Every structure is written in C-alpha cells, then in structure tokens.
Amino acid sequence: MTVANWQVRDFTRILNAGELQGRLEQARTDFGALLAEIVYFHPPGATPEEGDDEYILTGQGLVYVYLSEQTARQCALNRLLPSNSSNFGTVVTAIPPWLMDTQTLNLTLQERCDQGGIVNYYHGSRTNEFFLAIMLSNCFVRFGTDEINGASYGFYARRGNYTEEGEDDDNEIGDEGEAGGAEIRDYQFGDLVNYPIVALGSSRLSA
C-alpha cells in the first residue's frame, strides 16, 4: 500500500486525552508500517542521492497544525496543508492537543505564528479547535522552540521566509547519518498525493 491509499484517521469524536494519545500513536505506527523508511514526493533521479526533492521519513513523531473544523476537514479530504502565515507558508508545532486547553494553545500559537494567511490564531479560542496530525518533510525548518513543563516543543514552517533555529534536535529531518558516514535506507518514490495527513482530530479534550 502507498500513501495515496492511506485513509486519514478521523478522531474528531474522541474527546478523552488518554484515548486520543493512544489512537494517534497507533495511527503513526500504522502509517509508517505501510511505507519504506524514506518516501519521496517525486522521483528525484536515478538514485535518491541525486535529487533534492521533498520527502518524509516515516519513523518520526507527529506534529500538528491547528484549524477550525471546516478547514481541517477540507484539508484532510483533499490532502492539503493550509496557509497560516502571512507569506503563505504552513506553520506546525510539536505541541500535542492534550498538553493545554484550547484557549492557552491559541494564545501560544498567536505569539509564534505571524498574523496572516487563511488560518489566523487571533480570531478567538474557538476558531482553531481541531487539528491535522502529520509528519514533517525535509522542506520544513525549525524556527522556534517553547519550553512547557520542562519539555521542549518545536515550531516548524514549510515554505515562506523562515530562518532555521540554532541547533537541530533528534526529531528533525536532516540529522540522519551524521555518525559513521552515509547511511543506506530503504526508500520509495512517486507515492505521495499532495501532502499526507495521518489523522484529523479535536483538541476539545477532557482529562
């Protein structure tokens, strides 16, 4: 099976934080099990090393883009990422939906995401109560980090004028094979349709 055949998991009716966390982890595992370790958006050439095309590593964790229900459902249906910055890029975060209430999360996103694009985080706490769970492609850059309850959570942007934050961490694409030279990985290409969405859900959760 390829990414094109992946059916986006709809978790919008799951409002218990613990259950949602478990379902998302299972979706991440199932999604990764369908694919090779590296999946290219387009054939990069005779070998992966020859191209500079967009790809994802399927062994990584999930990140989230927060949206209104209508926009989230449209994006999940059409496998699209929304514009939520003034330069028409997409900003996502590693902050999971169960970490804080929607109002606090919205304020955090408002501080981190410049005001513009289709999705805006300053229209009120109830406008972005849903999320898309995705995996980062190599076209995302980490432009910021927030520390919450002693843990660090990154903010990432795809396209637009964003500058890479100082040091990389283990969750970022681009760290592979630093030690011991080039690492041989299983790969496939030409299987992605638009942008793969792993799951859709609601951030209006109970403990």
UniProtKB/Swiss-Prot annotation:
Keywords: Crown gall tumor, Plasmid. It comes from the Bacteria. InterPro entries: Glycosidase (IPR006064). Pfam families: RolB_RolC (PF02027). Involved in tumor formation and increases auxin and cytokinin effects in host plants. This is Protein 6b. The gene is 6b.
